[in-house]
């Protein structure tokens, strides 16, 4: 029995079976490359669902982690820390927003944004207490906690977790008429992924996000953009909403905000929204801790200094155009933006992901029939060409 097999057996014995990972153990990583305990090398084309946009163990981010770990790692929000304000300033200026509220995981940030939207609805918009509604979209994925589960359109995500939370409406992604029909006097917010990731890399029709912006302005509704996976350069723009030249009222960021090193997420909005929170109304023991702040400052600097959005745009266009040249009866469509690309198949994508793993390329199926490609944004054209050869071989 190999070391990898021993580790997988141990994991399966003691761990809850809420994931079905590919049968590979990763023990080392650098840049776009990972290794298993046996020394086999693989190209990472998933980036931990976009958490590793800057590449595995980016030296600037690792150095920031080490330097901060030698000073102080956690004080809780009961006290001030010396780098939280610096991080606030950097992330607020990046997004063009007045304030930031830090959390740890993406799901926590989504919950925070929903709480902010509801309290804003009552305190600012004047909706009758306990009547606020939030509109989301079929195919959405905003996390695994109760609010995101309640607004999901996937039955399996909800099975056995009732009673679900009230106050959510769902419409078809990209359908303007359904969206307009769902709006009423109690609508507090529209929550949208600018590109739906888990649903299969679904890109909205051109101008759809602009329509959402216009409807929100017309009806005094908050436009909340969940940019956890598509943001911070993944789509070829700093924010995926930039494709429609719109600015949401609320950004939700996570994943790459921690540089693949430490979990940190944030809700960004102007004073009118985040000032609804008063002392004791929301919080997080670890949110905005010194270690996370230091890592995130470095992670943001890498995104900007290395122009990762620009790299994603240029290389993504090349990668997508080459994928579209592959002719195979199983391929239904190739779609995406930047280095956030899906190949939709007429059959299950899992066998293709397993075949690619045997070829030394790691990716993951999503929505059963879509192969998702989201490599670290530091990938080179030469490395993409290597990936293309492997992808072509499994469709030969």
UniProtKB/Swiss-Prot annotation:
Cofactor(s) it depends on: pyridoxal 5'-phosphate
Pathway: Amino-acid biosynthesis; L-proline biosynthesis; L-glutamate 5-semialdehyde from L-ornithine: step 1/1
Compartments where found: Cytoplasm
Modification type N6-(pyridoxal phosphate)lysine: residues: 255
GO molecular function: identical protein binding; ornithine aminotransferase activity; pyridoxal phosphate binding
InterPro entries in the cross-refs: Aminotrans_3, Aminotrans_3_PPA_site, Class-III_PLP-dep_AT, Orn_aminotrans, Ornith_aminotrans_bact, PyrdxlP-dep_Trfase, PyrdxlP-dep_Trfase_major, PyrdxlP-dep_Trfase_small
GO CC list: cytoplasm
CDD domains membership: OAT_like
Annotated keywords: Amino-acid biosynthesis, Aminotransferase, Cytoplasm, Proline biosynthesis, Pyridoxal phosphate, Transferase
Reaction(s) the record says it catalyses: a 2-oxocarboxylate + L-ornithine = L-glutamate 5-semialdehyde + an L-alpha-amino acid
Highest taxon of the lineage: Bacteria
Known EC number: 2.6.1.13
Entry-linked Pfam families: Aminotran_3 (PF00202)
Biological processes per GO annotation: L-proline biosynthetic process
Role noted for this protein: Catalyzes the interconversion of ornithine to glutamate semialdehyde.
Similarity remark: Belongs to the class-III pyridoxal-phosphate-dependent aminotransferase family. OAT subfamily.
Protein name, per record: Ornithine aminotransferase
Protein's organism: Staphylococcus epidermidis (strain ATCC 35984 / DSM 28319 / BCRC 17069 / CCUG 31568 / BM 3577 / RP62A)
